[in-house]
Amino acid sequence: LSRYSSLRYKALTARQKGARGLIVVSGPNSKVVQQLAPMTFDASLASSGIAAISVTDAVGDKLLAGTGKTLKELQDKLDNGDLMGGIDCKGTLAANIVIQQEKKKGRNVLAVLPYGAEPDPHVAPLIVGAHIDHLGSSGGSNSRAKGDEVNKIHHGADDNASGVGGVLEIAQWLADLKKQGKLTLKRDIIFAAWSGEELGLLGSNHFVEAYAKMIKGDANAKLTGMFAACLNMDMIGRFQKSLVLQGLGSSSLWAKEIEKRNAPIGLPITTQNDAHLPTDSTAFYLKGIPTLNAFTGSHADYHMPSDTADKIDYQNAAKITKLMGLIARGIATADAAPDYITMEAPKNS
């Protein structure tokens, strides 16, 4: 659950639910050295309209005054697994926030396998993608490392060299089939390595917003029907008990398609309906595009320098890549694209 506990995921969830601001408090059970969060935050929120502040436990308890509850009581319940909804806090909170932006350039890397001699913009293409960025030589605020470990190289073998490797293998396989005359595509396939995922889905969001701006004149416009689907791979290298396929609720096609394509492979699979995820597929789903994300689960090395290549389960990563490749081939050779189903984000998520 560590990837869902990050401030980034919580902020993205709050923003999707229409929050105007986010107040972060550590809580008395957290036993942190400093109660205030570091003065760095998600780059994707720079122009989102959501403000974020960190407060001490004492201030947090003052905000709860009048509700009959304390931070300690609430955190005890959460620590014990008790789910709860929101708490109505009366009053108004005012804060002066100064943001210092540091701008850098990131690059998405895309390639197209056209179904004809040239790419055809009139037929909805399939997207097969994975994020290419990680945390670098010092993990920053997204690192889970402590002490001197923070300044070590964060290799990102599973997160997400494994996913990028899968995209490259699928691209090579399908391109070879087409070259040999063994593949009759009905639509183009776009292979994408997204930048800035760890900073808040920056690369994939830029792509869909720029595309919407170019085609419809509005970066916020929906793109339903403009792309057949988005297949995403984020952390597929540390197979545990089963492969997790997320976003099945985004299309009625996925369940049968997965069962059909997995038959010759035999991977144990766990499915999740929700398409609101802390990964690049969400950028496409929110634009009206059906999505499917492959994920083998979090682990103790997540966002740590210890996420290294020697720990990758290459045999099962290859099986997962084969499955996603077969699904990609099925969509790219079908006359009709998968349908899109609108889902609300889960409550209390």
Identify the function of each model-found stretch:
Residues 17-22, 89, 122-126, 185-189, ...:
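Loop/turn elements at helix/coil->beta-strand transitions in domains of secreted/extracellular proteins
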Residues 1-51, 114-115, 122-125, 134, ...:
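Extracellular/luminal Protease-associated
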Residues 15-17, 46, 86-87, 102-105, ...:
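Extracellular/periplasmic catalytic domains that process cell-envelope and extracellular macromolecules
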Residues 15-20, 24-27, 60, 64-79, ...:
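Sec-exported extracytoplasmic/periplasmic mature domains
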Residues 3-5, 9, 13, 30, ...:
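Acidic/histidine-rich catalytic neighborhood of metal-dependent amide-processing enzymes
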Residues 49-73, 194-299, 313-317:
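Metal-dependent peptidase/peptidase-like ectodomains
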Residues 165, 172, 300-344:
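His/Asp/Glu-rich mid-to-C-terminal helical/loop segments that flank catalytic regions of hydrolases
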Residues 46-156, 169-172, 176-181:
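Soluble metallo-hydrolase cores and metallopeptidase-like ectodomains found primarily
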